[in-house]
A protein has these predicted regions:
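Cytosolic regulatory regions of ion transport systems
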Residues: 1-462
């Protein structure tokens, strides 16, 4: 065993199998939430590196072994998460944990064949969740490509509301505008809930003055969001075609979603066997068996005229260089997939288009689930996103019972600083609240804040 046993009485007992990119991201997020974590992996060096960095226990061994799970404390575990690179091992781990413990189980399953059978696997193996980082990352990329001028598009309220991140261009209508004047000069159906300026994140008040170069996150319905973008002079049309470099699982999931949206897709992959498999799974895509890191190959594939470029080679350095090249040689919307944290500080200073960290897409979903199990029965967390490099959170709460926040005018309640209620969803209606609005039982409420660790809607109160 590596690490020191540190029982945090308020936290859950969590076992994580797999110390790769996803497992490490889960440790990073969940350790910061105050849980008791035991990490299992066959690689002693990986275990030691993580236990040196975080206050967690580490165990070297096979997570599918009953004996190893017993040593890890399966009898007292509340949650068991298997996120190795092997779908079969993850399912075996969860099966053993479910039979021998009383914990909730979550498995990573990323193979397309298994992913299509997720409902069957959950039911028959008693899994609480099946997670697929590649598929979820593809959904994020697909949403972002639906609005090419956006740096990020997130979905809330079962698709009724979007949170969209854009950078204010020089000379734009918003440059120099106070947020309180937005309704008078542009629209009333948009809430600007977070702003990043010169590396600092703000939850803006009505008196906050927007500036060119600001990164803003705003919330609106899909229709109103596009209307707002048109009014401020930004294009909202869908891309026509996309070029993907790399033929892995994430490329398959992304191409499948783009083709379904009517977008022409080309994939460059150097491995002939992968090309053959992709041509069968994606008959409407153009599959090119060549080296996508070769400048001439990219030119022949039409990089100069393509509308979207997404490098998914599996190697961060290649993806970054390809994105920089595409930004220089084309007008394409560029999305850069980054797997590791090593480059995070550098990546944030580079013009790489929209940057996606797949491991954090999944870890946000699991953190939301864990917080929902930890909180009171008065509400549940439905959706959680870390935004602006985890310096702020966007949380969607479902209010299930009367509490200190229900039945009162918002203007009569005192909220924590750096917090904004972005919307209230009541039945199928979206309300962008003012001071006279109230929160009712049955509502979904979205909160954006630079405070961290909210588990319950009542945490918004000062």
């Amino acid at each position: 065993m590596f690490g020191n046993k540190n029982n945090k009485k308020s936290g859950m007992n969590i076992i994580i199998v797999g110390c790769g990119k996803v497992g490490s991201a889960l440790v990073e997020r969940l350790a910061g939430e105050g849980h008791n974590i035991t990490l299992i992996d066959k690689d002693a060096a990986k275990i030691q590196a993580v236990t040196n960095m975080y206050d967690v226990m580490g165990l070297v061994g096979n997570g599918g072994s009953y004996g190893v799970q017993v040593e890890a404390g399966i009898d007292t575990a509340d949650l068991f998460i298997a996120v190795t690179d092997s779908d079969e091992l993850n399912l075996l781990c969860c099966t053993v944990a479910k039979r021998e413990g009383k914990c909730v189980t979550i498995a990573r399953v990323h193979t397309p064949e298994y992913s299509k059978e997720a409902g069957f696997l959950k039911e028959k193996l008693g899994l609480e969740m099946i997670i697929n980082p590649e598929y979820e990352a593809a959904k994020v990329m697909s949403r972002t490509l639906s609005l090419p001028m956006a740096e990020e598009v997130s979905s809330f309220a079962h698709g009724q509301v979007e949170m969209i991140k854009i950078r204010i261009p020089e000379g734009n209508t918003l440059d120099g505008m106070k947020i309180k004047d937005l309704g008078r000069d542009v629209t009333t159906n948009v809430v600007i809930c977070a702003v990043e300026r010169e590396g600092e994140v703000f939850i803006p008040s009505g008196m906050f003055i927007l500036r060119a170069g600001d990164l803003i996150s705003f919330v609106a319905t899909r229709k109103d969001a596009r209307g707002f973008l048109k009014k401020i002079g930004l294009k909202t049309g869908q891309i026509r075609d996309a070029l993907i470099v790399g033929g892995g699982k994430d490329a398959y999931y992304l191409a499948e979603q783009l083709i379904r949206a009517g977008i022409e897709v080309s994939i460059i992959e150097r491995n002939a066997d992968k090309c053959e498999a992709l041509s069968i799974m994606l008959p409407k895509a153009v599959i090119i068996n060549d080296d996508g890191t070769n400048e001439e190959v990219l030119k022949e594939a039409g990089l100069h005229n393509i509308q979207a470029f997404i490098p998914l080679t599996g190697i961060d350095e290649e993806n970054i260089i390809l994105s920089l090249y595409a930004k220089r040689m084309s007008e394409a919307k560029v999305i850069t997939r980054v797997s590791r944290n090593n480059f995070k500080s550098i990546v944030n200073t580079m013009d790489l288009g929209s940057v996606i960290f797949p491991k954090y897409v999944i870890s946000d979903a699991i953190v939301a689930y864990v917080r929902a199990r930890m909180n009171s029965m008065d509400c549940n967390i439905e959706t959680l996103y870390h935004i602006f490099g985890s310096r702020a959170e966007a949380i969607e709460f479902m209010v299930e019972n009367e509490s200190a926040v229900t039945g009162k005018k918002l203007s009569d309640m005192k909220f924590k600083n750096n917090l904004r209620i972005a919307y209230i969803r009541r039945k199928n209606n979206i309300i962008f609240p003012g001071g006279d609005d109230e929160i009712h039982v049955g509502d979904s409420v979205m909160v954006v804040t630079t405070n961290t660790g909210f588990q319950d809607i009542q945490d918004i109160l000062a």
